[in-house]
């Protein structure tokens, strides 16, 4: 049987909110296995969202119901069930297959958003996205081409040759 995770997404967080304060806020709804604020890998600063993993589905659902739209550290937060970490790509602003601006060359990927990433980027596999470093599909600043990307990756070519 596959491991089941009862994880919720928490958005709209203050940059000052840390893993411990996130856990403290959600632990009243059930057993919290993990709490994680997502940070920018270059600056180390919070990206304004995180995840809380519960021991049970019931605890996760109670937390979502109770905390969505509530104040945490002076900000109204958004809480919903996290999407599973599958590698089937697509999604985001602009969606898969070109994204904002479409493909820039005959190769797959290019454009702002890239194929499979979209604005904000996909985290698994081809695509990249605006500023994404994960995946290799291009996009603005993406991992395999695109403006600011690496030369010669699997993607839509570089903005400048």
Curated annotation (Swiss-Prot):
Keyword Nucleus on entry: no
Annotated GO biological process: mRNA processing; response to abscisic acid; response to cold
CDD domains: RRM2_NsCP33_like
Residues annotated as domain RRM: 6-84
UniProt feature coiled coil, ranges: none
Keywords assigned by UniProt, alphabetized: DNA-binding, mRNA processing, Phosphoprotein, RNA-binding, Stress response, Transcription
SUPFAM superfamilies cross-referenced by the UniProt entry: RNA-binding domain, RBD
Keyword Kinase recorded: no
Designated name of the protein: Glycine-rich RNA-binding protein blt801
Organism: Hordeum vulgare
Lineage, opening ranks: Eukaryota, Viridiplantae, Streptophyta, Embryophyta, Tracheophyta
Gene: blt801
């Amino acid at each position: 049987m596959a491991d089941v995770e009862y994880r919720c997404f928490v958005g709209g967080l203050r940059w000052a909110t840390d893993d411990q304060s996130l856990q403290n806020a959600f632990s009243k709804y059930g057993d919290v296995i993990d709490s994680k604020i997502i940070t920018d890998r270059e600056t180390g600063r919070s990206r304004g969202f995180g995840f809380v993993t519960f021991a049970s589905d019931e605890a996760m659902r109670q937390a979502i119901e109770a905390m969505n739209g509530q104040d945490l550290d002076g900000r109204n937060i958004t809480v919903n069930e996290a999407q599973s970490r599958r590698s089937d790509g697509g999604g985001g602003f602009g969606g898969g297959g070109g994204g904002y601006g479409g493909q820039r060359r005959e190769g797959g990927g290019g454009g702002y958003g890239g194929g499979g990433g979209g604005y904000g980027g996909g985290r698994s596999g081809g695509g990249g996205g605006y500023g994404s470093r994960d995946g290799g599909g291009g996009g603005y600043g993406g991992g395999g081409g695109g403006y600011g990307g690496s030369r010669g990756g699997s993607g839509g070519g570089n903005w400048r040759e």
